[in-house]
């Protein structure tokens, strides 16, 4: 919508107050929205046995991409000169749209020409659950037009009767090709599709063709074609609406989709075949069909020769009900920190019965953090950890529930802390080409090891000094937990003066700073993956920082490094000044003293990245109107710059002036993944690189501006061009929007937590683990009633059960709540299943109809 102040004021309104609602009956959610939320988490591990080059230089420079259908949403770093590249890159993102295939493409990087696709792994959406949480080797498949087929066609067939002038009868077949949806991208762009419609039989092949639709993956054809089916017999009333059995069985309609190549060869997009005998019992047939590869596709390719790819994939689809349904489960979980012993709490029991503790940790941490319950819960489970720790040197070094909870907490709340502390120096390291290799075996020809040592020491010193002076920026919740850890460690090992520091450093240095240094892209500190030399530099820095921060190693005469060259290098830092600085920093971040807030005076860095923006105020549509710019968002302003690192912004929008952030219809500029930032001047139209990136920008912009005054209630989903809005045809530029703005999101700009979604995830985990929950319940019952001699530990070693009676009661509560939640979920699943009729857009026909 145009951002004139009077129109904006007229469009804004206060949201009505929510009324108190009694606990709903099962099935009451029918009249309210059930949110279907998708996410993908996993790891691209490695590829092996890739095809070598034919020439003398056989090695390849490889990278891997993740694609939703054919839209790239993630890219790994380039691994140079390898036929078995080791990527080891973790990924996580929300999936904002429907998709048919999740694909992984392995590329050979080519500087002068287009990158070469070596092969791909394509997994149907419905098959993703078969690979959830498991590392699997997949054979690479060849990439050609046949393997890239995707999308669906909406088709209607009718059979009419015609009587010719000479009295013979023929059947007229009416083919209405209505639309297509989700056609593949061609070279990363929307295609120019057209369809050929053929009636095929033993002795005929009549073909017709639609018009070409420009730059769209969802063309609306709405074209009707007529085919005559002649009959040898003369017209009789008896056979008036019959087609001879031998004819109808042999005729079929074939629709082929093509991309118009103009000056180059047209590209095959897929085909469907519909036998005419679908009209045997009905004179009309209408359905959506899934596009298929050609029957004579390339079946001879030796796919085993292309190599293989090892992946770990976890796809999640949550059906989030209205908030009222989650009240009892949420209440039970939030009581967990107060349960004695903590092992009898609902949150702890969930971690015990889940196949992978990590699955339970993330939703638990986010839910408890949202309600300020994480510190007492983490303290309680850490205390349980300490009971089993016999050696102070191994304190909090394992992967227990306590350490995993704290790891996730630091990732969630520590993002801004890392940006203000590490990002400037990491930018300097990544943008520089200084060599820091000090391993004699890995030195390149011409390298000077002494110069490299000085380079490495410069970076380590600069990073170390920044970290130890950053205590004022450390988030309060981290400080609170560090304080608790320090106190508990001192009580557990009162005779060890260093344990109070190692308890804190094992988290803040080993699991926080050191990890962020070695993988800055994972923590959103860098927009792209570093090259191989930079990764090596960051690894050496990370090792040194990790050891510097480990108070235990500083109290010994020797460092903990295994490599001789690292031991020699670390001698530069074994000075009293470093020890004092570490101790002072750890004291400050584990203190309960109130800190002067530094977060409110400095803007919080939220997101940055390269996107395309449309020149404002232009009245024509054209490629030149879209410019590539570097966007930066803080808690105060949205800016864009000519390139990364530019200090002077080309354009600035204060966050307080943002009135709405909404998606823009693809038809506005014939471009995908566009959104609009509506503010007090002309709307800013932006194109993201993919749907995931667009969704992330919309979410963070909505969060940061959610509490602004005069936010819009209605907006225009298209653009104002040539004197009218394309969406509603209104002529006034300041006309009230024609579509309601989407619902708001949580207002916390640093921590975006959807508590209903997290509770739904926990419900799903309990549901998947009911068998183990039952076994735990049986174990509690056995322990409670058993009066004989003490049993071997193996009998109950699968579970931590300190108090069988309290644990049993909690399990009973969990089962009762889950059983009640099952009812609305089952009702929704049945309703969804019945609405997705075979042949509908949601459930298209695969293969030939019958």
Curated annotation (Swiss-Prot):
Residues 1-32, 825-850 are annotated as: Disordered. InterPro entries: C2_dom, C2_domain_sf, PH-like_dom_sf, PH_domain, Ras_GTPase, RASA2_PH, RasGAP_CS, RasGAP_dom. Residues 1-24 have a biased composition (Low complexity). GO terms for biological process: intracellular signal transduction; negative regulation of Ras protein signal transduction; signal transduction. GO terms for molecular function: GTPase activator activity; phospholipid binding; zinc ion binding. GO terms for cellular component: cytosol; perinuclear region of cytoplasm. Keywords: Acetylation, Cytoplasm, GTPase activation, Metal-binding, Phosphoprotein, Repeat, Zinc, Zinc-finger. The modification Phosphoserine is found at residue 555. The keyword Zinc-finger applies. It is found in: Cytoplasm; Cytoplasm, Perinuclear region. Residues 20-138, 149-289 form the C2 domain. Zn(2+) binds at residues 716, 727-728, 738. Its main location: cytoplasm. The keyword Kinase does not apply. The modification N-acetylalanine is found at residue 2. A zinc finger (Btk-type) spans 708-744. Residues 604-706 form the PH domain. Residues 372-589 form the Ras-GAP domain. Inhibitory regulator of the Ras-cyclic AMP pathway. Binds inositol tetrakisphosphate (IP4). This is Ras GTPase-activating protein 2. It comes from Homo sapiens (Human). The gene is RASA2.
């Amino acid at each position: 919508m145009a951002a004139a102040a009077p129109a904006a004021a007229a469009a804004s309104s206060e949201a009505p107050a929510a009324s108190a609602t009694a606990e709903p009956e099962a099935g009451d959610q029918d009249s309210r929205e059930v949110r279907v939320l998708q996410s993908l988490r996993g790891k691209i591990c490695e590829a092996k046995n890739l095809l070598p080059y034919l020439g003398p230089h056989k090695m390849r420079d490889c990278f891997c991409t993740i694609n939703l259908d054919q839209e790239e949403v993630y890219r790994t770093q380039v691994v140079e000169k390898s036929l078995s590249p080791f990527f080891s890159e973790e990924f996580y993102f929300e999936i904002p749209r429907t998709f048919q295939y999740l694909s992984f493409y392995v590329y050979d990087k080519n500087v002068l020409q287009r990158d070469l696709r070596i092969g791909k792994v394509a997994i149907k959406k419905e098959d993703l659950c078969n690979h959830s949480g498991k590392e699997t080797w997949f054979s690479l498949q060849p990439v050609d037009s046949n393997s890239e087929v995707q999308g669906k066609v909406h088709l209607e067939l009718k059979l009419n009767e015609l009587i010719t002038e000479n009295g013979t009868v023929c059947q007229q077949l009416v083919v209405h090709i209505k639309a297509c949806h989700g056609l593949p991208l061609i070279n990363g762009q929307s295609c120019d599709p057209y369809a050929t419609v053929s009636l095929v039989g033993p002795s005929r092949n009549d073909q017709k063709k639609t018009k070409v639709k420009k730059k769209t993956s969802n063309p609306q054809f709405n074209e009707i074609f007529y085919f005559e089916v002649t009959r040898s017999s003369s017209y009789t009333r008896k056979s008036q609406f019959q087609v001879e059995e031998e004819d109808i069985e042999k005729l079929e309609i074939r629709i082929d989709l093509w991309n118009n190549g103009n000056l180059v060869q047209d590209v095959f997009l897929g085909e469907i075949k519909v036998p005419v005998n679908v009209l045997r019992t009905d004179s009309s047939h209408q359905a959506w069909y899934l596009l298929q590869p050609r029957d004579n596709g390339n079946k001879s390719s030796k796919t085993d020769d292309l190599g293989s790819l090892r992946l770990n994939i976890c796809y999640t689809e949550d059906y989030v009900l209205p908030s009222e349904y989650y009240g009892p489960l949420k209440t039970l979980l939030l009581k967990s920190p107060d349960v004695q012993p903590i092992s009898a709490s609902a949150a702890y029991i969930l971690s015990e019965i889940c196949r992978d503790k990590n699955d339970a940790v993330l939703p638990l941490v986010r839910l408890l953090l949202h309600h300020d319950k994480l510190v007492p819960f983490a303290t309680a489970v850490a205390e349980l950890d300490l009971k089993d720790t016999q050696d102070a040197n191994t304190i909090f070094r394992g992967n227990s529930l306590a350490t995993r909870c704290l790891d996730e907490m630091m990732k969630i709340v520590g993002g801004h802390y890392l940006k203000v502390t590490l990002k400037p120096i990491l930018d300097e390291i990544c943008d520089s080409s200084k060599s820091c290799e000090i391993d004699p075996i890995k030195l390149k020809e011409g390298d000077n090891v002494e110069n490299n040592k000085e380079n490495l020491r410069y970076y380590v010193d600069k990073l170390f000094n920044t970290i130890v002076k950053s205590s004022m920026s450390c988030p309060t919740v981290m400080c609170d937990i560090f304080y608790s850890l320090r106190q508990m460690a001192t009580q557990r090992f009162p005779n060890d003066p260093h344990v109070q520091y190692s308890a804190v450093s094992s988290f803040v240095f080993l699991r926080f700073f050191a990890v962020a240094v070695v993988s800055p892209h994972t923590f959103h500190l860098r927009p792209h993956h570093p090259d191989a030399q930079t990764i090596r530099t960051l690894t050496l820095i990370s090792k040194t920082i990790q050891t510097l921060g480990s108070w235990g190693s500083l109290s010994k005469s020797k460092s903990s490094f295994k490599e001789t060259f690292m031991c020699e290098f670390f001698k530069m830092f074994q000075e009293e000044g470093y020890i004092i600085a570490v101790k002072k920093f750890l004291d400050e971040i584990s203190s309960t003293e109130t800190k002067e807030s530094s977060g409110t005076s400095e803007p919080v860095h939220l997101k940055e990245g390269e996107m395309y923006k449309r020149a404002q105020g232009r009245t024509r549509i054209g490629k030149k109107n879209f410019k590539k710019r570097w966007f930066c968002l803080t808690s105060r302003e949205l800016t864009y710059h000519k390139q990364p690192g530019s200090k002077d912004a080309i354009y600035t929008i204060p966050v307080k002036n943002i009135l709405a952030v909404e998606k823009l219809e693809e038809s506005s500029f014939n471009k995908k993944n566009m959104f609009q930032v509506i503010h007090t001047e002309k709307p800013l139209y932006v194109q993201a690189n993919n749907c995931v990136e667009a969704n992330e920008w919309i979410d963070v912009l909505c969060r940061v501006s959610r509490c602004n005054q005069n936010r819009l209630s209605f907006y225009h989903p298209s653009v104002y061009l040539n004197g009218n809005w394309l969406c509603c045809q209104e002529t006034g530029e300041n006309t009230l929007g024609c579509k309601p703005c989407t619902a708001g999101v949580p207002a916390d700009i640093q921590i975006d937590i959807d508590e209903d979604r997290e509770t739904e995830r926990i419900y799903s985990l309990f549901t998947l683990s009911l068998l183990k929950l039952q076994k735990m319940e049986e174990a509690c019952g056995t322990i409670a009633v058993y009066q004989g001699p003490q049993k071997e530990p193996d009998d109950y070693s699968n579970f931590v059960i300190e108090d069988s009676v309290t644990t049993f009661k909690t399990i009973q509560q969990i089962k009762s709540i889950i059983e009640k939640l099952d009812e609305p979920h089952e009702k929704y699943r049945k309703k969804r299943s019945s609405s997705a009729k075979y042949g509908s857009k949601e459930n298209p026909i695969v293969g030939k109809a019958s």
